[in-house]
Regions:
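Acidic, surface-exposed loops and disordered segments
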Residues: 2-220
């Protein structure tokens, strides 16, 4: 089943764009008493995948560790300094890139055509333009492409979670070569991009200092 349209939600608690974006902070210690039910976690992901992706390939995959067993698996691949997050968060979401997303590309656009979103001519044009590039691509290209798509989704997930009233911590400190197999996925297909702890902060997070924009900008 392909849901191409963005999901509208009734769970948004904070619809203040400025607050969601500019007051988001990473949290390392969560309130362990706070639990997020799976229905809301699924809604958060449903909203997350309205993020943009190259050629609408949607090259992302999510593993949600929200049980004791799942968290134990997550902890087994995390670096020790990230244990406080997994021990206290409501759930940890691993965002992975799917290097084989192009194999179902026809299904996505055929569905769009059936629903009258695009004409058969436009669909065929899309197939001719983009599919050969991916079908003949190197593994390195497919991995890089999937990581870009999934990075877009990961950032969106941080903001969607905050809009739902939750705090997050994006994590890259894990054994990347063990993530897929730990969760029963094909490591040749799925490449880990980020782990995201989600829950409610146990205390007010520290505000970080940022570089001035002029220090990291070039105009030409």
């Amino acid at each position: 089943v392909f849901n191409i349209t963005a999901t509208m939600t009734t769970n948004i608690k904070n619809n203040d764009f400025k607050d969601v974006v500019f007051n988001r902070q990473s949290v390392r210690q969560f309130d362990p008493a706070v639990k997020i039910d799976r229905a809301e976690l699924q809604t958060i992901i449903d909203e997350t995948i309205s993020a943009p992706s190259a050629c609408n390939l949607q090259s992302w995959h999510f593993v949600v560790a929200d049980t004791a067993e799942g968290k134990a698996k997550a902890k087994s691949v995390l670096m020790k300094f990230n244990y406080p997050q997994i021990d206290s968060c409501s759930a940890m979401i691993f965002v992975l890139g799917d290097t084989q997303s192009h194999l179902v590309y026809r299904d996505v656009w055929n569905k769009a055509c059936e629903e009258g979103r695009i004409t058969p001519e436009k669909r065929d044009e899309i197939f001719k333009t983009f599919l050969p590039m991916y079908e003949n691509a190197t593994p390195e290209f497919l991995q890089a492409d999937a990581m870009i798509d999934s990075s877009m989704a990961a950032m969106q997930l941080l903001l969607i979670a905050r809009a739902h009233g939750y705090d997050t911590n994006p994590i890259a400190g894990y054994a990347a070569d063990k993530v897929a197999t730990t969760f029963g996925l094909d490591p040749k297909r799925y490449v880990p991009v980020m782990a995201i702890a989600i829950g409610k902060a146990a205390s007010q997070p520290i505000t970080t200092t940022r570089y001035d924009g002029s220090q990291v900008t070039e105009f030409c």
